[in-house]
Amino acid sequence: MDKRWSLKGMTALVTGGASGIGYAIVEELAGFGARIHVCDISEAKLNQSLSEWEKKGFQVSGSVCDVASRPEREELMQTVSSQFDGKLNILVSNVGVIRSKPTTEYTEDDFAFHISSNVEAAYHFSQLSHPLLKASGYGSIIFVSSIAGVISFDAGSIYGLTKGALIQLAKNLACEWAKDGIRANAVAPNVINTPLSQSYLEDVSFKKALLSRTPLGRVGEPNEVASLVAFLCLPAASYITGQTICVDGGLTVNGFSYQPEEALLSRTSLRRVGEPNEVSSLVVFLCLPAASYITGQMVKPFVLMEV
């Protein structure tokens, strides 16, 4: 096999890898020849998954870890460093938690819950893995974000905030750590068919609305996210960094395709059709001296529908 399309001899850490998208990512990376260490908060799920991978001949080990705990993160990275001789090629920050509520109902505990698991853990793991990734001579970080970090999505504002933060973190690290031979990218899935998303997919009205806005007309599968993650870790993707790629069946680009007016308005935040003077007022402003530092921007009349 062309070495550009192989991970043989490379090492990886996948957080939250015992089920769902994380499980699929482990299988994909292992299939390309990587040696992998997995962490998960559930010891039962982890042991079951490790047993399955052993039967398949994959080189996978694992540790129980609550990524929201700083001491446990540090202990995990010590284990990884020892196991892989101080070198790591791939970090996949996959763990994500969600509590869906209206913004006015979120509590301080809800905020801390999302930030510690979705943002702080990813940030700290990046810091801890930096010397190992640098030592490998070929490092790749993948943040599993969400379309909720790209567009407004009915999943809770705090969740969207945390997933958007991962996208920006990928951009920053891509620039800051390029000199160390480390790439950083994010993948942003739509709702994927995993145990975590079943409560949403069992909601008939939610699923109908979701699929009506997804051009491919179906829910994605975990291996459809995992295949992109694996590609971004391959030498074949060596010039791709700082990017966010949506794995969403086309949802985020479906700004306006023909549909009945009621369907159009259901996708428009203000729930009405715009007027010509609401566009012309912006055009006039952009021509004024007051807009003298605005240039090269694309202003979309349908912006409220597309966000």
Curated annotation (Swiss-Prot):
Q: What is its EC number?
A: 1.1.1.-
So which domain of life are we looking at? Answer: Eukaryota
Q: Name one Pfam family in it.
A: adh_short_C2
> What keywords does the record list, in alphabetical order?
NADP, Oxidoreductase
Catalytic residues per the record? 159
Give the CC-aspect GO terms: cytosol; peroxisome
Q: What name appears for this protein in its UniProt entry?
A: Tropinone reductase homolog At2g29340
